[in-house]
């Protein structure tokens, strides 16, 4: 589904760097515990700093919460159902301004079919970033 969503807005999968906040899957696909996120967060921070992205699209609530808190958007935080598809701008530690776009995780559409249409609309928001590449 992710490849399909990227293709729908003209972004080749090869142009996207995808990583996870927790680097190994929690048992039985449970939500990650706070101590697991804390353990792996420095690795994610270093990946982001090395790549210096112009846009971070968070997939799911755990990455949304971490990234928005980490990069000074904690005052904008709300449930993913309220802020998905919105664009937030923040200044990164290296001085660049970037956009952060919270999105539902594509896997959520497996369990909740109406989210597929929501994801398609939310990905459309990022189409303008492709044009301004």
Walk through the language-model features, giving the residues of each.
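A polyanion-binding, active-site-adjacent surface
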Residues: 1-133
């Amino acid at each position: 589904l992710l490849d399909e969503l990227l293709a729908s807005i003209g972004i080749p999968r090869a142009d996207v760097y995808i990583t996870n906040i927790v680097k190994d899957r929690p048992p039985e696909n449970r939500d990650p515990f706070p101590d697991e996120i804390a353990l792996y967060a420095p690795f994610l921070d270093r990946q982001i700093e090395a790549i210096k992205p112009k846009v971070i699209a968070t997939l799911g609530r755990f990455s949304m919460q971490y990234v928005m808190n980490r990069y000074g958007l904690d005052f904008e935080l709300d449930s993913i159902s309220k802020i998905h598809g919105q664009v937030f701008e923040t200044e990164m530690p290296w001085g660049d301004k970037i956009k952060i776009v919270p999105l539902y995780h594509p896997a959520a559409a497996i369990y909740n079919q109406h989210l597929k249409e929501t994801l398609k609309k939310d990905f459309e928001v990022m189409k303008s970033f492709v044009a301004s590449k």
